[in-house]
């Protein structure tokens, strides 16, 4: 069974190609034009053990918002496609990830009901290279809404914006890997309703 999703999406603001292979090895080929964001998407692929391709052309002369949000939309759509009928997955998983003083928790339910509870307050606004830290929830919201996930993300502690954002991406990645893993003990779709 091949769990691959591929999306091509073009608007007046962005032109994107995203490919996700859930049963990958954690490789990434990412080019968004936003260096720190590329680094975060690479970390997401590596720690979720999925293969990820992102080719994005955006209106970066305006700012990074459209590129980050539209990458999240396309990433979510590709993930939803790769999940298929969701048969055999574990469905639920959580992860706590530290990065120096920062500690972030992510909890994922591959529920088919999109909801994001995002309690990661960055203590101070900062640009990380050409990446605005306040775009982080926009990315996760776009992924969650388009993949049909329920996700809770919490900052346990931390004060360095770089560490907090990176721990958030890695915690989400680890929880996503756990929730989308095929478990041979699971027969069919893991829901009493019979569908997700």
Task: Walk through the language-model features, giving the residues of each.
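Structural preference for solvent-exposed beta-strand-turn elements
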Residues: 1-196
